């Protein structure tokens, strides 16, 4: 067999804080359980990850390439209003909340790669800033402020590789 097959999957699932109009209001929205203060999907090896690994196992010359995601540091200021989905009369509705929740990636920016991008047999790509004056030393390579970092909940290091992802 010659070469490898690759596929690009530069999308992911909503998790933790996302800014948008999901409730009908442009604001921060919490994509987690109301009682949670930290999003449990970050770093979690879920059904989608298992499916990617099964595909990779059954197609050994195929490499799925996934985006690490861009949620790092996202979230409102502590105590600011955001929206969260709760069940009312058997249906999901968006309600205002001022509950203090951890920004995506917490204080240090780690553990914010969402489920669906933590498979064991996929290549996960993070974003880095451009190096404007040429590479001279490792410190010249700087991850984009928004790009997701691991580790996964089972201790694996993700992302696997970083490429230029700012002002491309």
Q: Which sequence ranges carry the predicted segments?
A:
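Loop-rich non-cytosolic ectodomains and luminal regions
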Residues: 1-168
């Amino acid at each position: 067999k010659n070469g490898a097959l690759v596929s690009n999957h530069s999308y992911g699932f909503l998790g933790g804080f996302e800014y948008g109009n999901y409730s009908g209001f442009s604001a921060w929205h919490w994509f987690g359980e109301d009682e949670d203060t930290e999003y449990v999907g970050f770093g979690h090896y879920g059904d989608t990850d298992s499916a990617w690994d099964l595909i990779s196992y059954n197609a050994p010359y195929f490499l799925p390439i996934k985006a690490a995601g861009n949620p790092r540091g996202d979230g409102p200021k502590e105590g600011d209003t955001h929206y969260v989905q709760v069940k009312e009369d058997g249906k999901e509705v968006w309600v205002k909340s001022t509950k203090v929740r951890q920004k995506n990636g917490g204080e240090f920016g780690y553990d914010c790669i969402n489920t669906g991008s933590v498979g064991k047999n996929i290549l996960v790509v993070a974003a880095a800033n451009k190096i404007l004056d040429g590479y001279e030393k490792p410190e010249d390579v700087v991850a984009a402020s928004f790009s997701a970092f691991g580790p996964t909940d089972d201790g694996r290091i993700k992302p696997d590789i970083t490429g230029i992802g700012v002002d491309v």
